[in-house]
Curated annotation (Swiss-Prot):
One annotated Gene Ontology cellular component of this protein: cytoplasm
Function: Reversibly transfers an adenylyl group from ATP to 4'-phosphopantetheine, yielding dephospho-CoA (dPCoA) and pyrophosphate.
Protein name (database record): Phosphopantetheine adenylyltransferase
Pathway terms, separated by semicolons: Cofactor biosynthesis; coenzyme A biosynthesis; CoA from (R)-pantothenate: step 4/5
Keywords: ATP-binding, Coenzyme A biosynthesis, Cytoplasm, Magnesium, Nucleotide-binding, Nucleotidyltransferase, Transferase
Organism: Wolbachia sp. subsp. Brugia malayi (strain TRS)
Record-linked Gene3D superfamilies: HUPs
Length: 167
């Protein structure tokens, strides 16, 4: 791996993508030469939006930010996807201590599977540390504004989802 072309993967379900995710993406771009947003098609995790729509929402956010980041959906082991993308770094965001426990375990497993791929943890910024996709979906489901947590485009998808769900 050429150190002058460091590729990083920022994986997640992005169900939906929030300002917390965007914060990590912007900061991760400073650490790598090329960042790939890996939208996971996790069969063990029930998602509200399908992978195609989650990928589309992430792509729209990247276009809005005018940053050079690739968005790719993947399925299966994260380290396998990272290797396929020639990545040397996996970037994970941490909101709280509870995130660290899980993420630390996953980084250890990933290291055992592919030691040449490192994991970097980025703590959430103070103003995004309590944003979670689950909270955003619940607030939207209850009919409240989520404009402080997600973009207008994501808000529209949540409104559409809740409109369909109430029919």
């Amino acid at each position: 791996m050429n150190i002058n072309n460091r590729i990083g993967i920022y994986p997640g379900t992005f169900d939906p993508i929030t300002f917390g995710h965007i914060d990590i993406i912007k900061r991760a771009c400073k650490l790598v030469d090329r960042l790939i947003i890996g939208v996971a098609e996790n069969i063990n995790k029930h998602t509200t939006f399908d992978a195609k729509l989650r990928t589309s929402m992430a792509e729209n956010e990247i276009k809005r930010l005018e940053i050079d980041v690739d968005v790719v959906s993947f399925n299966g082991l994260l380290v396998k996807f990272a290797k396929e993308q020639n990545a040397s770094v996996i970037i994970r965001g941490l909101r709280a201590v509870s995130d660290f426990d899980y993420e630390f375990q996953m980084s250890w497993v990933n290291y055992k599977l592919l030691p040449e791929i490192e994991t970097i943890f980025l703590p959430a910024s103070e103003d995004t540390q309590f944003i979670s996709s689950s909270f955003v979906k619940e607030i939207a489901r209850l009919g409240e504004s989520v404009s402080k947590f997600v973009s207008v485009g994501v808000q529209k998808e949540l409104i559409n989802l809740n409109r369909i769900g109430s029919e």
